[in-house]
Amino acid sequence: MADNDAFEEGYDAYWDGADVSDNPHEEDTDDHRSWEAGWRAARKHDYDESDG
């Protein structure tokens, strides 16, 4: 899986209600880190919109 795919998967997972601990990728892999980065980006986007 490409890093970008994992990022998008994590981003979408946040909006689907997944917890960061639901990351399906093996720890200490690029996909795991990318998925988590996507999840965290979505959460930041969610909170940033809540402030406005």
Ranges and model annotations:
Residues 1-52:
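Intrinsic-disorder/low-complexity detector
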